[in-house]
């Protein structure tokens, strides 16, 4: 037990720290408004392609009726090879030049960030997005098994979702470049909320259909929802970088690293709550038993169905509204950059 805790804590902490450094680095590599949109959406595309490679492993094993343990072990072997290779490439093949700039104490910066309304709107939107996506991700296999009785299709369904996520990023990237980042991100989350609400009614409609019909219809709905899956996150990150420029123009201190640490730390709260809350509520409050699958009571299955759909829908709509109020446009950012220089 302790070995697993320490291993996961170390791995997750290292990933988080590397992620903060990478996001902060992006604000230096792409200092202009549209350059950041291009860079961070490209980063997301590469990340999803890498994710597709990983999730294709259990999907392929699933087709050949491999066991659950075999799926987990295969991903573990991939990680054992991939992580050291990534570290090696990052340390020895990436050119990183230190730039001269004023820096501030991160803890002192955090106090200032708590008062930054523009930043905190983005952070709140990110927390809502993280909570919604983490909740649906954590409950997806349970939902497929207990509600639709399609547990054997779960890995392939996730694979379809991620394929269309790659396609969707190009759409939201185009809208962000054509109009503004906050408009594209807000529209993306509005679309996600509508699609997830539609999925709820589709699930009710196909609940008594044959297995093949349920799988086909659900795959189509997941594909349409997948278009929105990774569209908002890179745009929000790009907007945080713009806010760090505004902060630097005001204080003459570069706080991008501290700001992304602040943003990432609070966003992780959304992920953490979404992982813990559903299982505690389902098992301890309403008595849902994961091991029973579709044999759970109708009340507990209905609770799962409503929780799985309506909590994310509310989060998506709220985040969409919050992002629509963002106040740093392309023109405003140009003025900010002039003040820095």
Feature roles, as predicted:
Residues 1-341:
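Membrane-embedded alpha-helical bundles of multi-pass transporters/translocases
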């Amino acid at each position: 037990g302790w070995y697993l805790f320490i291993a996961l804590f170390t791995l997750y902490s290292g990933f988080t720290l590397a992620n903060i450094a990478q996001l902060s680095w992006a604000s230096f590599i792409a200092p202009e408004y549209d350059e950041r949109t291009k860079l961070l959406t490209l980063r997301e595309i590469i990340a999803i392609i890498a994710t597709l490679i990983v999730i294709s492993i259990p999907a392929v094993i699933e087709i050949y009726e491999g066991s659950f343990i075999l799926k987990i072990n295969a991903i573990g072997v991939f990680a054992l090879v991939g992580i050291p290779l990534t570290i090696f490439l990052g340390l020895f093949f990436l050119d990183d030049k230190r730039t001269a700039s004023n820096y501030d104490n991160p803890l002192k910066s955090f106090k200032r960030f708590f008062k930054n309304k523009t930043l905190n709107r983005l952070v709140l939107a990110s927390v809502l997005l993280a909570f919604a996506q983490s909740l649906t991700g954590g409950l997806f296999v349970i939902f497929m098994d207990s509600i639709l009785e399609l547990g054997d299709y779960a890995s392939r369904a996730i694979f379809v979702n991620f394929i269309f996520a790659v396609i969707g990023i190009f759409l939201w990237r185009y809208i962000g470049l054509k109009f503004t980042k906050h408009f594209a991100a807000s529209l993306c989350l509005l679309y996600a909320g509508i699609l997830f609400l539609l999925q709820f009614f589709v699930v009710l409609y196909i609940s008594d259909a044959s297995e093949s019909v349920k799988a086909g219809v659900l795959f189509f709905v997941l594909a349409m929802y997948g278009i929105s899956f990774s569209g908002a996150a890179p745009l929000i990150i790009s907007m945080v970088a713009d806010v760090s420029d505004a902060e630097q123009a005001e204080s003459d201190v570069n706080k991008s690293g501290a700001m992304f640490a602040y943003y990432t730390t609070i966003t992780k709260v959304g992920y953490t709550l979404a992982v813990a809350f559903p299982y505690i509520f389902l098992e301890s409050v309403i008595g849902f038993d994961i091991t029973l699958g579709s044999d759970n009571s109708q009340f507990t299955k209905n609770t799962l169905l409503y929780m799985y759909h309506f909590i994310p829908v509310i989060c998506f709509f709220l985040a969409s509204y919050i992002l629509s109020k963002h106040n740093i446009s392309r023109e405003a950012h140009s003025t900010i950059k002039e003040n820095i220089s």
